[in-house]
Amino acid sequence: MTKLHKYLPQRTLSKIVGWLATREWGLLTQWAIRLFIRHYGINMQEAQYPDIGHYPSFNAFFTRYLKRELRPVVEEPLAIASPVDGIISEMGQIKGENLIQAKNHHYTITALLGEDPSRASQFLDGDFFTAYLAPKNYHRIHMPLDGRLIEMIHIPGKLFSVNPASVQTVPRLFARNERAVCLFETENGLMAVILVGAMLVGSINTVWHGTVVPTAEGIAVHNYREKNIKFKRGEEIGHFKMGSTVILLFPKNTIQWNPNCQPKGTICYGENIGTVSLIEVA
């Protein structure tokens, strides 16, 4: 099935599904949502509003909130909070500028960040964390550390599926799919939070920009250095309208991963995935 991706009209299919997901068809919508819940085994008791009737459209259902008490954000001062609910695809050290996508599949920071060597150089030999949000998961994205938004780079691209089978077979998938690279300044240095689009994902959305739409000019760079947009650890920064992938990047020698976090393991947003290394100021 994954070999068919290159032949499918990815963007057209995604637009059709996105349009359907906005339709408010009453009982028909509720019936479809119930089928989806049953198929994916979704626990609606975790939702802030468990009643299916609360959701007039699939988009409202996809972007449902969870009960806050079920996702406490780690309180340790130096802890890095998981930005999402999902499965850890890969994590670890960046080898030079190479990241692991899956066994025998690698891609580069330069390609991931829009072929900008100067931007990529800040993460050489750093650390990365890749999480996959399945269709059944909570689809909102949260801040791993306190930080100030300095830049967002929207990079148009393909819309391959990012499910585990595709990640293991499509070369350089994350560096080819549409994505929004969000750069934050933290007390521990630079941090990148990358929202990767995928087939059938309605859109990438951030709280400061809204829906991120491709432009005719290609790569779009949004500078927020003068805007003073700040987020606390655990605060929402964006969402997907289906399910996709989030990648974190950190500079060299600035963090240590939680040894309890391993590839293929499940995570919930707010959980401790690592700690920052204090930077000494001369």
UniProtKB/Swiss-Prot annotation:
Binds 1 pyruvoyl group covalently per subunit. It catalyses: a 1,2-diacyl-sn-glycero-3-phospho-L-serine + H(+) = a 1,2-diacyl-sn-glycero-3-phosphoethanolamine + CO2. Is synthesized initially as an inactive proenzyme. Formation of the active enzyme involves a self-maturation process in which the active site pyruvoyl group is generated from an internal serine residue via an autocatalytic post-translational modification. Two non-identical subunits are generated from the proenzyme in this reaction, and the pyruvate is formed at the N-terminus of the alpha chain, which is derived from the carboxyl end of the proenzyme. Its EC number is 4.1.1.65. Its cofactor is pyruvate. The record marks 243-244 as: Cleavage (non-hydrolytic). The keyword Calcium does not apply. Pathway: Phospholipid metabolism; phosphatidylethanolamine biosynthesis; phosphatidylethanolamine from CDP-diacylglycerol: step 2/2. The modification Pyruvic acid (Ser) is found at residue 244. GO terms for biological process: phosphatidylethanolamine biosynthetic process. It is found in: Cell membrane. The active site is at residues 85, 142, 244. It is an enzyme of class 4 (lyase). One of its GO terms (cellular component) is plasma membrane. Disulfide bonds: none annotated. It is a peripheral membrane protein. The keyword Isomerase does not apply. Keywords: Cell membrane, Decarboxylase, Lipid biosynthesis, Lipid metabolism, Lyase, Membrane, Phospholipid biosynthesis, Phospholipid metabolism, Pyruvate, Zymogen. Its main location: membrane. One of its GO terms (molecular function) is phosphatidylserine decarboxylase activity. Pfam families: PS_Dcarbxylase. Catalyzes the formation of phosphatidylethanolamine (PtdEtn) from phosphatidylserine (PtdSer). Heterodimer of a large membrane-associated beta subunit and a small pyruvoyl-containing alpha subunit. Belongs to the phosphatidylserine decarboxylase family. PSD-B subfamily. Prokaryotic type I sub-subfamily. NCBIfam families: PS_decarb. This is Phosphatidylserine decarboxylase proenzyme. The lineage of its organism: Bacteria, Pseudomonadati, Pseudomonadota, Gammaproteobacteria, Legionellales. The gene is psd.
